[in-house]
Amino acid sequence: MLTNRQLLILQVIVNDFIRSAQPVGSRTLSKKEDITFSSATIRNEMADLEELGFIEKTHSSSGRIPSEKGYRYYVDHLLSPGKLSKTDLNIIHSIFKEKIFELEKAVQKSAQVLSDLTNYTSIVLGPRLSENHLKQIQIVPIQPKKAVAILVTNTGHVENKTINFPAEVDLSDLEKLVNILNERLRGVPISELKDRIFKEVVIFLKSHIQNYDTILHALGATLDSSVQTDRLFFGGKINMLNQPEFHDIDRVKSLLSLIEKEQEILRLFQSTESGITIKIGKENDYEEMENCSLITATYTVGSKQIGSIAVIGPTRMDYSRVVGLLQHVSSDLSKALTSLYDG
């Protein structure tokens, strides 16, 4: 258990290092308004904090920097969400000022604004298509055995999927198929489309369309691939280049290479709990992120969690500001999407 004096010194060291990216010495601490005790006391307390593993030496300076353990203690016990400026709030609210008609635009704007306001990299995991309801479907033939299915959802999302038929399909049959699907499936959740087609719509297809079973199975396979698609939206992918920790080209190249691997990034969201979660340094799953922190917030439609927003920055990131921004963006995004889905 740290004493109040040690807590204060640790907090000031973390805050000063976040601001300056320079190791913090006892002389710097003695000039801080909040610290009123002697230089000797400061040095003794810093020595104790170092022995306990909360701060550590650097090779190039006599000052100290927070260790991962120090950051973790700071985040768990000393951190409070930063109060945002009026300008910050206006920028966030401007994303959602007008009624949102397309989910992708709201999510992509959220990612971009977060990266702009933090100067870090932001990632938004969009809701799966399965969360949407069908508004309209079109099937456009492009070759005798190939067509493109265009699904339009209630959130404005447009999904294009190629359908490969094992045999040539009559154009009039495709037209009948589209009419029946739109008549019977409008408003049905995307996740239920395949089931509804095979259990209910098949009766109508059977009586109106030749080779209906061939068409049906090809369409079913296409819908399966649509439902399972996770979508990632990025902002500020190369913002890490602005951070002094990433002036090492090899280090930043490995991180940027990881960010380009969509399946690897999706793993970062696999066990996301509701609310705000913070992973620091080696707590992250990847070696490329051992000098990074990842702060994640969830967003909802009504009470249902449907996606996540994350900010990746150096372990020296401004935790207070990022948490404050994530809380506001996730809250506003949740309200906008709830309105969009309910509408």
Swiss-Prot record:
Keywords: Repressor, Stress response, Transcription, Transcription regulation. GO terms for biological process: negative regulation of DNA-templated transcription. Gene3D superfamilies: 3.30.450.40, Heat-inducible transcription repressor hrca homolog, domain 3, Winged helix-like DNA-binding domain superfamily/Winged helix DNA-binding domain. GO terms for molecular function: DNA binding. HAMAP family: HrcA. Belongs to the HrcA family. Negative regulator of class I heat shock genes (grpE-dnaK-dnaJ and groELS operons). Prevents heat-shock induction of these operons. This is Heat-inducible transcription repressor HrcA. It comes from Bacillus licheniformis (strain ATCC 14580 / DSM 13 / JCM 2505 / CCUG 7422 / NBRC 12200 / NCIMB 9375 / NCTC 10341 / NRRL NRS-1264 / Gibson 46).
